[in-house]
UniProtKB/Swiss-Prot annotation:
Known partners and oligomeric status: Interacts with nop5. Component of box C/D small ribonucleoprotein (sRNP) particles that contain rpl7ae, FlpA and nop5, plus a guide RNA.
Annotated gene: flpA
Domain of life: Archaea
Record-annotated disulphide pairs: none
GO molecular function list: histone H2AQ104 methyltransferase activity; RNA binding; rRNA methyltransferase activity
Organism: Methanococcus vannielii (strain ATCC 35089 / DSM 1224 / JCM 13029 / OCM 148 / SB)
Protein name, per record: Fibrillarin-like rRNA/tRNA 2'-O-methyltransferase
Biological process, per Gene Ontology: box C/D sno(s)RNA 3'-end processing; tRNA processing
Length: 230
């Protein structure tokens, strides 16, 4: 076990000092002893923390890069779109603790990996579904406080608005990782980011934070918005 220093920087998100000057973040493990993606486990005051790798998590990258508004916190009910194999959802699960995190993934094979890696996390609800068609899982998902989206589709901003109309509480938050190259490989990414921001605003969001997540992900930006729509 390593002696470390931890400091809470957001609710249930910790800055980690290992004495080497490197910037690290971690979450306190909801399933001690269980790794999800080969992450490093470290210990302080008899608590286990999972180092959050920003190279494998866009939310982790945004936090490392100076995210100012972090709406996911203890007690937050979350709808996660694009769960993949569970890397970031597992950290969201740690943060929310005893509150439900609905995790939607489209690909059956990846969903099987997700279930295998996260089956000890009782607050994670895996849903095999298409984020483009929120009505298909509306019988499972209730109203939520936050929607997080990491779906590499040309209409990714529209997908967020669709799901917000179905599930997001008024004045709830959304976080979306926009991948410019999934929308148009011929355009300047900055132009694409402005277009996607406009779609989100016209769809009903007030954008309260935005942060580029390079060098961890090329041509990506994270938007945080408050839902003011219907």
């Amino acid at each position: 076990m390593e002696k470390i220093k931890v400091k809470e920087i957001f609710s249930n998100v910790y800055g980690v000092d290992l004495g080497d000057g490197l910037k690290r973040i971690a979450t306190k493990s909801l399933a001690p002893g269980k790794r999800v993606y080969g992450e490093k486990l470290i210990y302080s005051e008899n608590k286990e923390y999972r180092i959050w790798n920003p190279n494998k998590s866009k939310l982790g990258a945004a936090i490392i890069n100076g995210l100012k508004k972090m709406p996911i916190k203890k007690g937050t009910k979350v709808l996660y779109l694009g769960a993949s194999a569970g890397t970031t959802p597992s950290h969201v699960s740690d943060i929310s603790e005893d509150t439900i995190v609905y995790a939607v993934e489209f690909a059956p094979r990846i969903m099987r990996e997700f279930i295998d890696s996260c089956n000890e996390r009782i607050n994670l609800i895996p849903i095999l579904g298409d984020a483009n068609r929120p009505f298909e899982y509306s019988n499972i998902v209730g109203k939520v406080d936050v929607i997080f989206e990491d779906v590499a589709q040309p209409n990714q901003a529209e997908i967020l608005v669709k799901n917000a109309k179905w599930f997001l509480n008024k004045d709830g938050y959304a976080m979306i990782s926009i991948k410019a190259r999934s929308i148009d490989v011929t355009k300047n990414p900055k132009e694409i980011f402005l277009e996607q921001k406009k779609i989100l605003i016209e769809g009903g969001f007030d954008i309260v934070d935005e942060i580029n997540i390079e060098p961890f992900e090329k041509d990506h930006i994270m938007f945080v918005g408050i839902w003011k729509g219907n």
